[in-house]
Design a protein with these regions (language model features):
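Contiguous mixed-secondary-structure segments that line small-molecule binding/active-site clefts
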Residues: 36-48, 125-208, 212-225, 326-420
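Short, polar/charged alpha-helical segment
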Residues: 47-49, 70-92, 214-218
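Short, low-complexity disordered leader/linker segments with a strong preference
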Residues: 1-59, 399-422
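Short helix-initiation/N-cap motifs at beta->coil->alpha
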Residues: 97-110, 213-215, 228-241, 337-338
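Extracytoplasmic "Venus flytrap"
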Residues: 32-79, 99-103, 253
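Pocket-flanking alpha-helical
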Residues: 74, 97-140, 191-196, 247, ...
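Solvent-exposed, polar/charged alpha-helical surfaces in well-ordered, non-transmembrane soluble domains
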Residues: 78, 82, 86, 106, ...
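Pocket-lining segment of extracytoplasmic ligand-binding domains
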Residues: 228-333
């Protein structure tokens, strides 16, 4: 089948002059800064309808990370939109703009502040100096199971809780005029995907390796590969042309861009996750604080459905990735043990360095292991299971086949609820 084109690369977007910020009038917003009556989390629809009865309808511009509504990674945006519009009784309309068509990631913060975008997926990992906590947290995602379904659920819950429980992480958004709705999100475990077979140390030596975060630079160099930094939207063409030989890639990108059609030889860690999977955030712009309180609460509460959609997006894309690799004559295999050890050692050295720099606490490993134990128990309690392996994921997982809202509610009540607008 013909390759699916990658999402539009930010560099390819046509320059445009920013439109004037839209003028909005929020009914019930005292002094133009939020206000009005709110409602308790879990309130009935009748109670919410009463709270918003006198409020004017609003339309908010929403820029998610997916390239289109048909993308395997569109689920999080669609589930969020469905919840918000239904819960608001149609008074909040989310106008989705796909494919970073309004603002690339480099322009997104300005667009959120000046009003061109109201809500967005932000790949903050591309800006480690601006978001040092995401850069640090992306290097501690290896302390839980790599199981193809439960592993993604556990890791998503672990990192979401960590994000909400770290004040300086939340402040990194607020100081830029942004409101975090989900401050730390996963796009799935990392894999390596190559044009050619082989994951031994000899195979890695000299390869051009596309990297997605600062952790990957050190790992690629330890393998004697040459790290090449580029956003995921540029990676398909680079692999297709042979500009790069391999890429670090997560399921959401692998399954939604067709990367594995040109780099079908995938290697994964045998018994642990690869570092780097916490990369992004779901944020609101400057208009959020001017919304009536009840509208703010509806948007915030919608993160339960958005959390469900994030995991669904990961798994749906993961299924497609397995199909793509197989149809392109590739395979999913365990990383060569010697290469995996080199990579794992570097991962732990990066954690040691962050501790030495004071960017992570000395007991961070113990904290993450305790978190993994906690959320593993919750995932088991809620009945989520793996019915096969990653290699045959397309045989036993059906798209949109698992509802993760019950897990999302646990994350919300145990971590996010303390930050709910009030």
């Amino acid at each position: 089948m013909p390759p699916r084109p990658p999402p539009p690369a930010p560099a390819a977007l046509s320059p445009r002059s920013p439109p004037e910020p839209r003028s909005r009038s929020w009914a019930g917003a005292g002094g133009g800064q939020g206000g009005g009556e709110g409602f308790e989390y879990g309130a009935s629809q009748e109670e919410i309808n009463a709270a918003i009865a006198d409020l004017d309808p609003v339309t908010l511009t929403y820029q998610p990370g997916a390239s289109s509504q048909e993308s395997e990674t569109a689920a999080s945006a669609l589930r969020f939109k469905e919840y918000v519009e239904e819960r608001s009784d149609g008074k909040i309309t989310l106008e989705i703009v796909w494919g970073q068509a309004i603002a690339s990631y480099t322009e997104l913060e300005d667009a959120l502040v000046d009003g061109r975008v109201d809500l967005a997926f932000h790949a903050a990992i591309y800006f480690p100096e601006e978001f040092p906590t995401i850069d640090a947290f992306s290097k501690i995602t290896q302390y839980s199971t790599p199981a193809p379904l439960t592993g993604e659920a556990i890791s998503a819950a672990m990192m979401a809780e960590l994000g909400w429980n770290t004040p300086e992480h939340l402040e990194s958004f607020k100081e830029k005029g942004l409101t975090p709705l989900s401050p730390l999100m996963n796009s799935g475990d990392y894999w390596t995907a190559c044009r050619d077979t082989g994951s031994s140390l000899d195979d890695w030596n000299g390869r051009q390796m596309r990297i997605a975060g600062t952790a990957h630079t050190a790992i690629a160099e330890a393998l004697q590969a040459s790290p090449v930094s580029m956003e995921y939207g540029e990676t398909f063409e680079a692999l297709q042309r042979g500009t790069v030989d391999c890429t670090f890639v997560q399921p959401q990108v692998a399954g939604s861009t067709g990367l594995l059609e040109v780099a079908p030889h995938v290697s994964t860690f045998a018994d642990s996750r690869m570092t780097g999977s916490a990369t992004a955030a779901h944020v609101a712009g400057s208009s959020f604080e001017n919304l009536p309180l009840a509208y703010q609460q509806i948007l915030f509460d919608g993160e339960v459905d958005h959390f469900h959609g994030i995991i669904q997006s990961t798994l749906d894309a993961q299924r497609q990735a397995v199909i793509d690799a197989t149809e392109a004559g590739g395979e999913f295999t365990d990383m060569d043990p010697e290469a995996e050890k080199v990579m794992s050692d570097i991962q732990e050295q990066l954690v040691d360095d962050l501790i030495a720099e004071g960017r992570l606490p000395e007991d961070i490993r113990e904290q993450m292991e305790e978190s993994a134990e906690k959320w593993t128990g919750v995932v088991e309690e809620l009945g989520y299971t793996d019915d096969g392996e990653l290699t045959d994921f397309d045989d036993w997982y059906e798209p949109n086949g698992v509802d993760f809202r019950s897990l999302g509610e646990r994350v919300f009540t145990e971590a996010a609820a303390a930050h709910r607008p009030s």
